[in-house]
């Protein structure tokens, strides 16, 4: 779809959406996003120019259907997929991608660390995906030196970043905010460093007693991103991995650095979103969102949950969706889903489905709470369908129509029950929605009440 759009941009030193937005240009991607969001194109342009919105759209991902991430637009949901050395491979991950898109993922991250040729897996995912694809390039960089962290060099990392940009990756998690001087701050944590990328870089810094190479080479990464329009997703390497560690000195020190890196990228018109926690008690979520907005000048906030309790193993998609809904309400722009397998194992296709639906609920609830225009229209239509016992319409309006139909038909499978004025919960005699309060009856009641003596 985008081949003609990007053809005339090729060869330019800077092809980012932010660069064009700051020149006053409304790109085809901005026009497309404006239609999807039902917002004025000029608003999209101004938000991208300001840095409050990003349109992750690598010029080499030509089959992409552009979308945006930002406070002015709908709250978005990301789904993580990816093969591992011990489970899954290309075929399974392509099936997960298909399911993720079916159930409403706005972006997908390929977090493959094994299971085959990583370049082959990534290329296949990009070619099959109409939604933006994100990656964490430090994973492949480590794989390129056979997992030996101490042998990893800045050149190895930059080579992988450039290669993934050429392949069409739309945004990359870059863990540039974890500095060597922050490592002692995790001494009193219960769970230390829980970011895989952050852990890799921490081990590298401990081995070499040198500064984080992603930080020292951040300008080199900016130059790569300018050429392909790759967006930064600044990784929170020191995010809390449990409630005990939330909002601590280590997390907030890194957040300040992420703000500095955001402004550095903006100086070169490179798009940025900032990643956030993690595991956060409900009463600290608003603080975390407000603090990110303050430190990072309102760059879009992309949160992993957060989980609001640490004891829901097997149900962390629920624990985290609670936190995600609150974060979205307070201003987070994108929610990274958590599946029931979080902390337990690699998610399968059904886990992807359950995690995504939980997060679509959270994002939608946030949009309603933020009074986004039209956010509640579908809910009101569902309510009308319920009141009219229009079962098929109820299924259609559900976030997961197949599951809604499956649960209804579990007890009342016959077609005749698709027009019945009850379900198996109340049966034919006790459903309160059968009590129709028609206008004529209510008018008569009002007249009766008005005629009653007062006092």
Swiss-Prot record:
UniProt KW keywords: 4Fe-4S, Iron, Iron-sulfur, Lyase, Metal-binding, S-adenosyl-L-methionine, Thiamine biosynthesis, Zinc
Molecular-function annotations in GO: 4 iron, 4 sulfur cluster binding; carbon-carbon lyase activity; zinc ion binding
Signal sequence bounds: none
Pathway: Cofactor biosynthesis; thiamine diphosphate biosynthesis
Domain of life per record: Bacteria
Residues annotated to bind [4Fe-4S] cluster: 423, 426, 431
Residues engaged in binding Zn(2+): 279, 343
Catalytic activities: 5-amino-1-(5-phospho-beta-D-ribosyl)imidazole + S-adenosyl-L-methionine = 4-amino-2-methyl-5-(phosphooxymethyl)pyrimidine + CO + 5'-deoxyadenosine + formate + L-methionine + 3 H(+)
E.C. no: 4.1.99.17
Gene3D superfamilies in UniProt: 6.10.250.620, Radical SAM ThiC family, central domain (3.20.20.540)
Keyword Metal-binding: yes
Binding site for substrate: 80, 109, 139, 175, 195-197, 236-239, 275, 302
Annotated GO CC locations: cytosol
Cofactor binding mode and count: Binds 1 [4Fe-4S] cluster per subunit. The cluster is coordinated with 3 cysteines and an exchangeable S-adenosyl-L-methionine.
Gene Ontology biological process terms in this record: thiamine biosynthetic process; thiamine diphosphate biosynthetic process
Cofactors (names): [4Fe-4S] cluster
Record flagged with keyword DNA-binding: no
Functional note: Catalyzes the synthesis of the hydroxymethylpyrimidine phosphate (HMP-P) moiety of thiamine from aminoimidazole ribotide (AIR) in a radical S-adenosyl-L-methionine (SAM)-dependent reaction.
Family: Belongs to the ThiC family.
Protein's UniProt name: Phosphomethylpyrimidine synthase
Species of the source: Synechococcus sp. (strain JA-2-3B'a(2-13))
């Amino acid at each position: 779809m985008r081949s003609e759009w990007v053809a005339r941009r090729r060869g330019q030193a800077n092809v980012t959406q932010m660069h064009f937005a700051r020149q006053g240009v409304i790109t085809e991607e901005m026009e497309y996003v404006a239609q999807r969001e039902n917002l004025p194109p000029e608003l999209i342009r101004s938000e991208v120019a300001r840095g409050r919105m990003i349109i992750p759209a690598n010029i080499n991902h030509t089959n992409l259907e552009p979308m945006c991430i930002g406070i002015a637009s709908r709250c978005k949901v990301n789904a993580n997929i990816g093969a591992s050395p011990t489970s899954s491979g290309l075929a399974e991950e392509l099936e997960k991608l298909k399911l993720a898109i079916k159930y409403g993922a706005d972006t997908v991250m390929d977090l493959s660390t094994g299971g085959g040729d990583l370049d082959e897996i990534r290329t296949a995912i990009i070619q099959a995906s109409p939604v933006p694809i994100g990656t964490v390039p430090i994973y492949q960089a480590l794989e390129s030196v056979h997992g030996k962290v101490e042998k990893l060099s800045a050149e190895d990392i930059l080579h992988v970043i450039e290669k993934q940009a050429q392949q069409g990756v739309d945004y990359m998690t870059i863990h540039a905010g974890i500095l060597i001087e922050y490592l002692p701050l995790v001494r009193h944590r219960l769970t230390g460093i829980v970011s895989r990328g952050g852990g890799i870089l921490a081990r590298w810094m401990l081995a070499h007693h040198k500064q984080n190479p992603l930080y020292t080479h951040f300008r080199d990464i900016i130059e790569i991103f300018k050429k392909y329009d790759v967006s930064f997703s600044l990784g929170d390497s020191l995010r809390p991995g449990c409630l005990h560690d939330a909002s601590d000195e280590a997390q907030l020190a890194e957040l300040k650095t992420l703000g500095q890196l955001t402004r550095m990228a903006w100086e070169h018109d490179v798009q940025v979103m900032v990643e956030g926690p993690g595991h956060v008690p409900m009463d600290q979520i608003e603080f975390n969102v407000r603090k990110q907005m303050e430190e990072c000048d309102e760059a879009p906030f992309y949160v992993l949950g957060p989980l609001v309790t640490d004891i829901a193993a097997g149900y962390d998609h629920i624990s985290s969706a609670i936190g995600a809904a609150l974060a979205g309400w307070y201003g987070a722009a994108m929610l990274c889903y958590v599946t029931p397998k979080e902390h337990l194992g690699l998610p399968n296709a059904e886990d992807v489905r359950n995690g995504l639906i939980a997060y679509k609920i959270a994002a939608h609830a946030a949009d309603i709470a933020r009074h986004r225009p039209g956010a509640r229209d579908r809910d009101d239509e569902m309510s009308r369908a319920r009141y009219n016992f229009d079962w098929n319409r109820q299924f259609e309006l559900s976030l997961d129509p197949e599951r809604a139909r499956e649960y209804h038909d579990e007890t009342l499978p016959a077609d005749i029950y698709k027009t019945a004025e009850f379900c198996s919960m109340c049966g034919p005699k006790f459903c309160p929605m059968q009590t129709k309060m028609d206008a004529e009856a209510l008018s008569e009641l009002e007249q009766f009440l008005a005629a009653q003596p007062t006092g």
